[in-house]
Amino acid sequence: MQGTPAGGTSPGPSPMDRQTLLVFSLILAAALGQMNFTGDQVLRVLAKDEKQLSLLRDLEGLKPQKVDFWRGPARPSLPVDMRVPFSELKYIKAYLESHGLAYSIMIKDIQVLLDEEREAMAKSRRLERSTSSFSYSSYHTLEEISSWIDNFVTEHSDIVSKIQIGNSFENRSILVLKFSTGGSRHPAIWIDTGIHSREWITHATGIWTANKIVSDYGKDRVLTDILKAMDIFIELVTNPDGFAFTHSMNRLWRKNKSIRPGIFCIGVDLNRNWKSGFGGNGSNSNPCSETYHGPSPQSEPEVAAIVNFITAHGNFKALISIHSYSQMLMYPYGRSLEPVSNQRELYDLAKDAVEALYKVHGIEYFFGSISTTLYVASGITVDWAYDSGIKYAFSFELRDTGRYGFLLPATQIIPTAQETWMALRTIMEHTLNHPY
């Protein structure tokens, strides 16, 4: 059930209904071993100035942690979204009100959305089993995606192959799909999805994109020209341990699952673990933080695997890392406000890409450098790519702008993937036509 964006009220369950729902949710979570988020809300705060932003940043340092920022405090012009556990709602709302921080309720009860999501997945799974098919309009588990990859590669072995580039902390295979028409060391394009495990729309978009490539090769002139001259690599599940955990225990888990002696909290933010700007602004040295950068650059096997693979290949010309949510297309730098040397070219290309995206379903995206469009973030994928000589480095933030956040309904998978494809196609075509 959604809270009204303007901060008003909407009809809710009666006390008896709510008690019944709570009991049902707790039983369901216990049976499935999954965390329960009944009563948790997502609040949106729009800070007026830097002072109010500072007050919001103070919430991240509370011990024990009381909020989970979905969109962190960045600048006064950008909303801050945070999940607040039911047990902390009274405290957090009082804190906001006492400091004059106006808020609205974006999601009134997270568990309601989670139950709807789980029910939709179960329904889709039953249909897939009865028809022996794979639904591109549904969310899937790691095991289902792995099975799909094997079948997909077998069915399209003339153009697709599977490469294992490493193993995760929990020893899961890190797999990449390679799309190629033959030859060795072609110029290449890298696409990764799901580096933050709770961003399920990114995995689903990647899967749809992979199928789109094989479906349109030989029919779409632009794509055909790209694949005749270049290879495309897609890593669908960049954070396999975290992704598996979002299905088995905590749907809202962001980091990987690495464990270190003497540290109570688990996991590293894989998008803060890269060498470029490691440990700088927009990352955190606190292992309990959602943006914990890890003990050292590329300490995480999931990051090291990509670095080693791309470096050994030596001929990648574009890298696109796909995240959610906020509807943005961005380029380096994230670590500072310093413009990159080809800033104008990247700006114009991003503009063309979001215009192509808009034409599909009328969805508007912001675009620009990461540090000026979203926030300063150090140790991130695209900064590393650019500093490693990959000229066309971009990061997407897919749908939506906060109504559902990381819990985007499966009904939006296909539209999201369709529009994202047109932006990807634009970037890849430009990369093809501007060799370096």
UniProtKB/Swiss-Prot annotation:
Chain's gene name: CPA5
Residues covered by the Peptidase M14 domain: 138-431
Cofactor note: Binds 1 zinc ion per subunit.
Disulfide bonds: 265-288
Keywords, sorted A to Z: Carboxypeptidase, Cleavage on pair of basic residues, Disulfide bond, Hydrolase, Metal-binding, Metalloprotease, Protease, Secreted, Signal, Zinc, Zymogen
Sequence positions that bind substrate: 196-199, 254, 271-272, 324-325, 375
Record's signal peptide: 1-33
GO cellular component: extracellular space
Enzyme class name: hydrolase
Family: Belongs to the peptidase M14 family.
PANTHER family: CARBOXYPEPTIDASE A5, PROTEASE FAMILY M14 CARBOXYPEPTIDASE A,B
Residue positions binding Zn(2+): 196, 199, 323
Active site per the UniProt annotation: 397
Protein name: Carboxypeptidase A5
Names of required cofactors: Zn(2+)
GO molecular function, one term: metallocarboxypeptidase activity
Keyword Nuclease in annotation: no
InterPro entries: CPA_M14_CPD (IPR034248), M14A-like_propep (IPR036990), M14A_act_pep (IPR003146), Peptidase_M14 (IPR000834)
Residue ranges annotated as propeptide in the record: 34-126
Record Pfam families: Peptidase_M14, Propep_M14
Alphabetical GO biological process terms: proteolysis
Its EC number(s): 3.4.17.-
